[in-house]
Regions:
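Rossmann-like S-adenosyl-L-methionine
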Residues: 1-171
Length: 171
């Protein structure tokens, strides 16, 4: 497998999505990750801004609920989807692969105060924004379980980092 596939395998092993779970995938790109979560049986919602990527995601993961636009503009729909049907036996899970700017403050607040996923897999391409985002998440009740660097671009100074976080007090 490629390094990217290994990173996704690690994320999936940590998240352990299943048929009872709802998984939100922010900055979902062309749907590669959506397909993976769907194949695990989870209910999946993705958000992506880029139009061509959204069209590819619709082809790659047609069963997923897919929203086009900025993640911050889709907070109402994300919240409604997570809450639809009232109580259910499954978990809330979050996978994010944001741009170099990291997670927007509104997305961080939504994550920690509204969505409150049991587990987060965060794939980052910027150590600086990752550090700032992790400070907020850990101050808000999340513990870092594992940090794995991936050299997707050998010969450059760019390193992708996968961080596995668990909400404190959850299994």
């Amino acid at each position: 497998p490629t390094l990217y596939e290994r990173a996704l395998e690690e994320a999936e092993t940590f998240l352990k999505p299943g048929p009872q779970d709802r998984l939100v995938d922010l900055y979902c790109g062309t749907g590669t990750t959506l397909r993976r979560w769907l194949d695990s049986g989870a209910r999946v919602m993705g958000v992506e801004l880029a139009g061509e990527a959204v069209e590819c995601a619709r082809l790659n993961a047609s069963e997923a609920v897919l929203l086009r636009g900025k993640c911050v503009e889709r907070i109402p729909q994300l919240t409604a989807w997570l809450n639809e049907g009232g109580d259910w036996a499954g978990r809330r899970l979050l996978y994010v692969n944001p741009p170099r700017t990291g997670l927007e403050p509104e997305i961080l607040a939504w994550t920690t105060d509204v969505a409150r996923p049991e587990r987060i897999a965060y794939l980052s391409c910027s150590a600086g924004t990752l550090s700032r985002n992790l400070a907020v998440l850990t101050e808000s009740g999340y513990g870092v379980e594992r940090i794995t660097p991936y050299d997707f671009f050998p010969g450059t100074r760019h390193v992708e980092t996968l961080v596995s976080l668990r909400r404190l007090g959850t299994v």
